[in-house]
Amino acid sequence: MTDYSIVHADDVDDVYAGTDVPGEFRPLGRALGLQQLGATLIRVPPHSDFEQGTGHYHEEIEELYLITRGTLTMRFGDEIVEVPAGSAVRVAPHTPRSHRNRGDETVEMWAVSRRLGRGDATKIDDFWEADPEAVQHRAP
């Protein structure tokens, strides 16, 4: 027996639609019927502060980010790095992280992790100063 599923990311609801977060967050786990993994497509428009100055970390989850388009500016703890398309980034549990797009092209990235079946993220308010040139809110 062959068991597989195919879903186009744009056919999955953007959970940030209707909010002021600039960008898209499309979790594909349910649509694909994933049992052990979580997979989310994240799109960050040009010159946008996707997490709006906040950050987060996970207690147990190790995350894999796959940058497939654009260059993403990521912060891990006190370090800020530029991550170009074609890069893979592993982030260990308890590592504070956030990201924004300082470039002229939309960033597309995939966040992949094991599925716990419960929330594991802790938000960090005021993780880094908002970029004064970045869009902080979704266009109406």
Residue ranges and their predicted role:
Residues 1-38, 45-46, 124-140:
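A short, N-terminal "cap"/entry segment at the start of jelly-roll beta-barrel domains
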Residues 41-45, 57-74, 112:
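Short, conserved beta-strand element in jelly-roll/cupin
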Residues 64, 71-73, 80, 96, ...:
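Structural motif
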Residues 74-75, 91, 97-103:
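Short beta-strand His + acidic residue motifs that chelate non-heme Fe in jelly-roll/DSBH
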Residues 98-140:
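Double-stranded beta-helix
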